[in-house]
Amino acid sequence: MENIRNFCIIAHIDHGKSTLADRLLEFTSTVSNRQMQAQVLDDMDLERERGITIKSHAIQMNYIYEGQKYVLNLIDTPGHVDFSYEVSRSIAACEGALLIVDAAQGIEAQTISNLYLALENDLEIIPVLNKIDLPGAMPEEVKDQVVELLGCDRDSIIPASGKEGIGIFEILAAIIQRIPPPKGDPKAPLQALIFDSQFNSFRGIEVMFRIFNGTIKKGDKVKFINIGKEYYADEIGVLKLQQEPQLEMSAGNVGYIISGIKEAKDVKVGDTITHVSRPGEPIQGFADVKPMVFAGIYPVETSEFEDLRAAMEKLQLNDASLVWEPETSIALGFGFRCGFLGMLHMEIVQERLEREFDMTVITTVPSVQFKAYLTKGNEMVVVNAPSDMPEPTTLDYIEEPYIKAQIITKADFVGPVISLCMDKRGIITNQTYLTSDRVELTFELPLAEIVFDFFDKLKTISKGYASLDYELIGFRESNVIKLDIMLNGEKVDALSAIVHRDKAYDWGKRLCEKLKDLIPMQMFEIAVQAAIGQKIIARETVKAMRKNVLAKCYGGDISRKRKLLEKQKKGKKRMRQVGNVEIPQAAFMAILKLDQ
């Protein structure tokens, strides 16, 4: 156990975590030259395409340092704010962390929030200055920022470059010297923390764990404490690039267990594995993840509902932060109400459903969770979808979630950033200059305002320099209302949205204009209306396709023409009473891009 080191890599997006991990694997000969490719650990196509890490990945390296053999367990973590839950799970399984800071970008919001996560868990932090080979690198200034943030020694910051392979040896030496070996007693009752799982269609569910106390042998009968189910450890082993089976593993190690589990709901991340014969106490796991954004996901063909359910269950194994429950919509039939961590997470889930499971899905307007208080008996209703909103007459008041957002940006862009946040109903609470050129702004904002396109806009106005991190600070009373969209007098529940009263008219008008362009012409005219309760606030008309019934009248009497036109009008009216309007997927997506 003395020679085991468990560590993870934390950094902001694009500061070079995955590239540095590649170099460490190459340097310790964990990966042969033949297997080497960029972002070795990012095994989803989606991750490679977007160049981001979505899942945490664990891998074991062997390294000989000063004549002794060490086992290093590396857990690579995502950097995006939507996936901070993945990071917190990885941190719980480690004793140390490499904090990577880009020498050209400096410290960003995500760096700080992940660092606080690591410090709360008493991890040993090794600061690494990455990308020092870039022409725009400012190693001395960034070192000052790191010293100020961590209060560490200037010399303890390791200059490195993942691309050029500079400083890799120093990093490995620091991991061995500075990170403490895992504590734990191999003879105590077994306690192993589950930090990830994935589905293998041949072998059932593979569970990744970190042993805190005790020893597990192949063939042992184990129990998952939270769920209370018992299994046999058919295969246990360590995670190299491929899995390597072992006969026994003891405290301090990170590995996987396969026991033919078929049911997705039997494995919960954060659960504890122990022996049936000699049970240990459950480990205090992580806080349950709280979804921030809710949206409906529906199959395009109603017959595919069961396939979609199976796909969602398999996806949940690998993505512990996805929450869902079945729901029905008048317009779209059966589907699921899903909770996501943010908009990027929602996009990724939708893309993974399409790629990995061949499901074409329709997503409805994303919304956040509101609390509606009724006038009768002080009752509280949780509103996750616009259709859950009680009638306006029964409402006393509504509360919406607020967040504290920390934005770090260059001094030149402070003005535009502040005005963007003011537009989004934000209040500025603090402004500090980290260096002469970098400012940290703290805002309190309604979560609903940043769900849509806040992040994109922030990047646009700051030329890509601003970085954002946010946390929930609770619910506050707010003047929000439900806006309905009606087509020919029928409400389309999937297009409803909950918006702030001040923005309702503008939103309704723009949405009607957008839908008018997107809904294909029918044989009858379609009235597109936006309504609050019974009051119509905007209307557009999609004109009908019509035949020129006067084509056969050359000259002729006006009354003859009028007769033909009246006849056509009656026919169109009859069609409108029985006709259904098909809403294209583009119409649902349009709502997300109303501002552009």
From Swiss-Prot:
Enzyme Commission code: 3.6.5.n1
Ranges for domain tr-type G: 2-183
Biological process according to GO: positive regulation of translation
GO molecular function, one term: GTPase activity
Residues where GTP binds: D14, H15, G16, K17, S18, T19, N130, K131, I132, D133
Disulfide bonds: none
Pfam family, one: GTP_EFTU_D2
Catalytic reactions on record: GTP + H2O = GDP + phosphate + H(+)
InterPro entries with a match to the protein in the record: EF-4, EFG_III/V, EFG_V-like, EFTu-like_2, LepA_C_sf, LepA_CTD, LepA_IV, P-loop_NTPase
Keyword Membrane among UniProt keywords: yes
UniProt subcellular location: Cell inner membrane
Primary localization: membrane
Keyword line: Cell inner membrane, Cell membrane, GTP-binding, Hydrolase, Membrane, Nucleotide-binding, Protein biosynthesis
Organism domain of life: Bacteria
GO cellular component, one term: plasma membrane
PANTHER family: TRANSLATION FACTOR GUF1 HOMOLOG, CHLOROPLASTIC, TRANSLATION FACTOR GUF1-RELATED
Recorded family membership: Belongs to the TRAFAC class translation factor GTPase superfamily. Classic translation factor GTPase family. LepA subfamily.
Protein purpose: Required for accurate and efficient protein synthesis under certain stress conditions. May act as a fidelity factor of the translation reaction, by catalyzing a one-codon backward translocation of tRNAs on improperly translocated ribosomes. Back-translocation proceeds from a post-translocation (POST) complex to a pre-translocation (PRE) complex, thus giving elongation factor G a second chance to translocate the tRNAs correctly. Binds to ribosomes in a GTP-dependent manner.
Identification of the protein by name: Elongation factor 4
Higher taxonomy: Bacteria, Pseudomonadati, Bacteroidota, Cytophagia, Cytophagales
